[in-house]
């Protein structure tokens, strides 16, 4: 055996044995896999697609839902080509209309004339996802402006049965259950006291691998805005004690930046729409976000330790509109061009500094922590070794799953990353240098 390898292995073993155990929260394997997805697609689809409303009234006739050419495989193929790893569908929005034949509701596709009452959007989408290797997720709003039980103790049991009909296996594995915290009045003018422990327990019983979204998790949290940006500082940890989803939760700042001393691992999910609204409208076909705007969102979400959930709403045909799909392909092409060539060479660690060779010009730095050991880095500096010596390029804060630092255009033979503040011994799992000639 090579002596150098033996010595290096012995040194690593000694370091591992002497390193103080990390005392902060750690992610579950499911949370690590979730954040590795980096980009998923949101599909807002339902009666609002046909009315132009964002929040339906719950009194819409079931026949209003009538997509003329539903093609969930087109959604999935589009998502896959754009680099998305999963799709979340609004199976039931606040209006109560169910995109599947929910046995405890009379406001579903079963009561519509679409496909003679035999249609099931969730079946079509889950099967398409399975065929293409894309993960399937669901948004099921507990608010129901149609169900007569809403606002009574019985409704919580009705909602559990709703969850069971989706999560019980008929549609296969569900990677994320999205709970909107909205809680308005039902048809009887009453509000509901949601039994969140019961709802969460139902999800975990039926889909134990699923990530549960809400403003306080427990799987992932809302980023605190719908504009598409996580905080420049963004911890994957959050203080959730004493909070209830949708009711006086953490401050917008805590949601956006996390809590350095957070007691639970609840990483941020950045949800934003490719259009001004969440549901499709013909009047917004000329307002789809530009590639420049989408790149900004990418850098400020994925590049700031968050997963990006980009809403791309199907139209009244039941298809992703050509304007949206074309823009997504342009966005994908831009990302592929930017990150095609990593000019970072060998890296050498000395204490809390890493020096990496630079094999060409660059203006983007990608850093990743080994988050299985926890999020540790609180601040770091970036320097480049040029003909004039070492020059500071950036001073930044957290890293987490991924941090993309936008640097000035630089030509250097080496880059040094120095962690200046951390909760414990820092561990970087990846260092990359790239040239972006697209984003301005």
Regions found by a protein language model. Give the residues of each.
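Extracellular Ig-like/FN3 beta-sandwich strand-entry sites
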Residues: 412-414
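Conserved catalytic region of serine esterases and O-acyltransferases that act on ester linkages
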Residues: 440
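Mature catalytic domains of secreted/periplasmic carbohydrate-active enzymes
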Residues: 18-409, 418-437
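Hydrophobic h-region of N-terminal signal peptides that target proteins for export
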Residues: 10-17
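Sec-dependent signal peptide recognition
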Residues: 2-8
